Amino acid sequence: MRHRKSGRQLNRNSSHRQALFRNLASALVSHEIIKTTLPKAKELRRVVEPLITLAKVDSVANRRLAFARTRNIETVAKLFNELGPRFANRAGGYTRILKCGFRAGDNAPMAYIELVDRPEVAAEQAAE
């Protein structure tokens, strides 16, 4: 029985899942919009939103916690220098998931996950 077990397994072992979400979180922070499968997008939301909340208070301890969770200096720098101040007045809900059809090869449901309040420049690049 799987009572009180939160999170999706996604047919991966725990280290593979951890690496997957580290990479997806870094990609989302750097590009501000990514296309992935719907279950991965829903689970990625649980990883990225606490990171952005952590980035709202810039301290050495918070930077170290963020680095421990992402293992990427560029991601931590963007979190604390850009995204933390951008979402300082927002109390949560930093991401938006938009369904975008099904993948051609295996008919998996696909979705865009993006950061809300993206600059217009990033929105134009994503459209191209």
Swiss-Prot record:
InterPro entries: Ribosomal_bL17, Ribosomal_bL17_CS, Ribosomal_bL17_sf. Gene3D superfamilies: Ribosomal protein L17 (3.90.1030.10). It comes from the Bacteria. PROSITE patterns: RIBOSOMAL_L17 (PS01167). The keyword rRNA processing does not apply. GO terms for biological process: translation. One of its GO terms (cellular component) is cytosolic large ribosomal subunit. Keywords: Ribonucleoprotein, Ribosomal protein. Belongs to the bacterial ribosomal protein bL17 family. NCBIfam families: L17. Part of the 50S ribosomal subunit. Contacts protein L32. This is Large ribosomal subunit protein bL17.
